[in-house]
Design a protein with these regions (language model features):
Chain A
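Bacterial signal peptide processing site
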Residues: 24-27
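N-terminal edge beta-strand
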Residues: 31-52, 154
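Mature extracytoplasmic or organellar-lumen-exposed domains after removal of signal/transit peptides
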Residues: 126-376
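Extracellular/periplasmic metallocenter environments
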Residues: 87-130
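Bacterial N-terminal signal peptides that target proteins for export
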Residues: 1-10
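C-terminal motif of bacterial Sec signal peptides marking the signal peptidase cleavage site
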Residues: 18-22
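Beta-strand signatures of extracellular beta-sandwich domains
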Residues: 69-73
Length: 376, 411
């Protein structure tokens, strides 16, 4: 079934237990060590009130006659987490990442937000659950980012040399390859808000007052393809290199977490493809969009490959869907290969673009679920 | 029809037991919301039972709005397709009951996108119906039997022939699977298609879709026929949702029709009919009325006083629309019409991009739509319309408890 969380499986089971026998829950996540919570129309019994911080599974059973709602409330009364629609006679596993503190566990029969509650105390610190594989994935990913950024800097140097020599043909040839490393790790670069606009802004995205400060790859792209000359543009090349070096100097102090930076970054890379590359907006003059497209996909694939052992264990169906999704996009891209690169995107017709867009959507949807699978 | 005629009571009875099944199944979640919507929002907010012998959205009182979508299946993996159809069925059962998809739109895991997209939160079920159909290309595409169902293609699911005047756009025609979403609230209909499309990513891709803003047909006996964008009531002699005898004879496929898995199902023909609004509006009232064979104000047939007075075809012009489309001119052929008006802005030449999204259900398109449409070759109305999109789909019987959309085909 669709790679929904164990929670969703439990929810569906309550709705249509017998509607679809094939989709009963392969619900194994919360079974071990779950805290039992028994709700009736006027009571809320919790099996354990001294809890340890971190990922905690509550097994909430509704023995009342009304649809119930389970809430974890912070001391200020705000909701930390809630699970709605727990039908009479059903039971759901609900996973919450608990920080240290005191909380109210509330059962609301009729889902009014009010009802009996129990106080619980949580001690310790919530972390990544100590999964060494994730720590290693994050370390490996950081090493990958460093290598890819070095690659972009090396190739950009050659590109800038050609720009400075006003060798238009050579610069055009080196333009797209110089961007590949960057496009592969773009979400990491975007963590430093100031670098991305300097090196990768498109003219169409600028405010009128920003146009005088425009710099980066796309300025040179326009000069090369539209004006046919980069005479006097050498300073922009130097600045591009300096900005990339600044990014490099910041990497040592950077920590990347598996959920937001890696899984979230993979999703962002596919978003980049879906909104910028498939439409041909990114490389409006050079039409080298497919080179960026491939680099974005490669960047997402690298992240997935690093996280895959964990994903396979926590959501095998998601891993299968992602394997299939990546394979399909890669196969489609192959159709448009030309020499070391890709055909000009303005020669890719509407039907082929639709096919690419469909494949990107097909990959982007399961990819958006990667973070939850890793965080589980 | 050889099987026992269902009769009024059977459909009624099953309709009600279907309702109780849904209520039973929904008891776990959101039932209170359905009941709430029912009491507070009146008829337009009600939920239409999802389970039953026939799919809802065919012999269901016509809702105000439409979102129709045709999908291409992008995988060759039968298991994956079946898995999606099961997921769709779950989602459809939830949405038609006024509940969100999966784990809902809010309150889930913070780092995950919500299962439901959320724009229908707080809206009543709005009589949402979701009706699925399978196009000829699902059974065989480019000579390939992708899902091992080629042999199960119903004889009645023919490729529609070219009709004179057709100007069909491939990007607005065909599709392996179609879903008709009808609701009294357009946001509810759009939400339904959007969420199905999202669940389907990787298995299906939207090929084309169409919004309809106003119904042009009624299946409710005695109700006035809503006007189309030409200002006329057309299709007065529709099949009523209460007329089980006519439904059994002209709408529901039977066991002996050549395709067992379609028994209780129906065939949908969808046509995007562009109307040349501006030239029509310059046409004299007399000519407009002659073209339809009805008067514009009341909708009465030529020579009669009331919309539902029996038409005397011989009194109409030989090329009048009603005369050519009438069952008496087509060997008794009848179809259940469920079309909607659309306006997709303007066409770049300052003209309304508007028309009728025609939908008809029938027991067999060969003796239904194709028969009638062939008669319309000489229709005087053709000067003002053009068929630009087309699809034909086999809509399987309704989902029973424990089943899923298409289970009789993929079993």
């Amino acid at each position: 079934m669709r790679p929904v969380s164990a929670l969703a499986v439990a929810g569906v089971a309550a709705v249509s237990m017998s509607l679809l026998t094939a989709c009963g829950g392969d619900d194994d996540a919360g079974a071990a060590g779950a805290i039992p919570v028994t709700a009736t129309d006027d009571s809320c019994e919790v099996g354990k009130t001294e809890l340890t911080a971190g990922k905690t599974t509550f097994k909430v059973t509704n023995k009342g006659s009304k649809v119930n709602e389970f809430e974890v409330l912070k001391p200020d009364g705000k909701i930390l987490a809630e699970r709605e629609n727990i039908g009479p006679g059903t039971s759901v596993d609900f996973v919450v990442n608990l920080p240290a503190g005191t909380f109210k566990l509330l059962c609301s029969a009729g889902q009014t937000g009010k009802g009996p509650s129990k106080d619980v105390t949580v001690t310790g610190t919530a972390g990544e659950g100590g999964d060494q594989r994730l720590a290693k994935a994050a370390a490996d990913y950081k090493a990958f980012v460093v290598v890819r950024l070095d690659d972009t800097i090396t190739k950009t140097k050659a590109f800038v040399d050609a720009v400075k020599a006003n060798d238009v043909a050579k610069a055009k040839e080196l333009y797209a390859p110089s961007r590949v490393g960057w496009e592969t790790i773009e979400p990491v670069a975007e963590k430093f808000g100031d670098i991305d606009p300097k090196v990768d802004a498109r003219e169409a995205d600028l405010k009128p007052e920003e146009k005088k400060d425009w710099s980066g790859w796309h300025l040179l792209e326009k000069a090369l393809w539209k004006d046919g000359s980069v005479k006097g543009k050498g300073k922009y090349g130097d600045q591009l290199l300096a900005d990339l070096e600044t990014l490099k100097s910041r990497l040592p102090g950077l920590t990347l977490d598996p959920v937001n930076d890696m899984a979230g970054g993979a999703k962002e890379l596919l978003d980049e493809v879906a909104t910028g590359k498939v439409t041909g907006e990114e490389e409006a003059f050079s039409h080298t969009d497919l080179v960026d497209f491939k680099a974005n996909v490669d960047g997402a694939k690298k992240i997935y490959d690093l996280l895959k052992p964990v994903v396979q264990e926590r959501d095998a169906q998601l891993a299968t869907d992602l394997d299939g999704g990546f394979a399909k996009v890669e196969a489609l891209l192959k159709k448009h290969e030309k020499g070391d690169g890709y055909v000009s995107y303005d020669t890719v017709g509407k039907d082929d673009r639709k096919e690419l867009a469909d494949a990107v959507n097909a990959l982007g949807e399961p990819l958006s679920k990667l973070a939850a699978a890793v965080a589980r | 029809m050889t099987e026992a005629r269902p009769g009024l009571s059977r459909r009624r009875m099953l309709g009600f037991s279907g309702a109780s099944l849904v209520v039973g199944a929904a008891a776990g979640a959101g039932l209170d919301r359905v009941a709430f919507a029912d009491e507070d929002k009146g008829g337009a907010g009600r939920a239409v039972p999802f389970l039953g012998p026939h799919q809802a959205g065919i012999a269901t009182p016509v809702q105000d709005r439409l979102h129709f979508a045709a999908f291409d299946v992008t995988t060759g993996d039968r298991e994956r397709l079946v898995r999606m159809l099961k997921e769709w069925t779950q989602a459809a059962a939830a949405m038609t009951a006024g509940r969100p998809v999966g784990d809902g739109a809010v309150g889930g895991v913070a780092v995950a996108p919500p299962d439901d997209t959320g724009e229908a939160l707080g809206l009543p079920p709005s009589r949402l119906t979701l009706t699925i159909g399978f196009g000829p290309s699902l059974f065989e595409k480019d000579g390939e039997d992708r899902f091992g169902i080629k042999a199960r293609r119903p004889p009645a699911l023919v490729d529609l022939p070219h009709f004179p005047g057709d100007a069909l756009e491939p990007a607005r025609s065909g599709g392996d699977i179609a879903v008709q979403a009808c609701a009294d609230d357009p946001q509810v209909a759009v939400h339904a298609i959007r969420n199905l499309a999202r669940i389907g990513f990787g298995v299906v891709a939207v090929r084309w879709s169409q919004l309809g803003f106003g119904k042009t047909s009624s299946t409710t006996p005695g109700a006035q026929t809503p006007r189309n964008l030409f200002g006329f009531k057309d299709g007065t002699e529709n099949i009523a949702e209460t007329d089980d005898e006519l439904l059994g004879r002209h709408v529901w496929a039977g066991k002996g029709d050549g395709s067992d898995w379609m028994a209780g199902g129906s065939y949908m023909v969808a046509r995007r009919i562009r109307m040349h609004i501006e030239t029509w509006d310059r046409t004299s009232l007399r000519e407009q009325e002659d073209i339809f064979g009805r008067d514009k104000g009341e909708g009465a047939p030529v020579g009669a006083r009331k919309e539902r007075d029996a038409p005397v075809l011989a009194k109409m012009k030989p090329d009048a629309h009603v005369r050519l489309a009438h069952p008496d001119s087509n060997g008794g052929a009848r179809i259940l019409r469920r079309g909607y008006s659309f306006t997709d802005g303007s066409d770049g030449l300052g003209r309304l991009e508007a028309g009728l999204f025609f939908i008809a259900f029938q027991r067999d398109p060969r003796t239904g739509f194709i028969r009638v449409q062939s008669s319309l070759a000489t229709d005087a109305l053709n000067e003002y319309i053009q068929h630009v999109g087309s699809g034909v789909f086999a809509c399987p019987p309704g989902v029973q408890k424990g089943g899923f959309w298409g289970d009789t085909l993929f079993a």
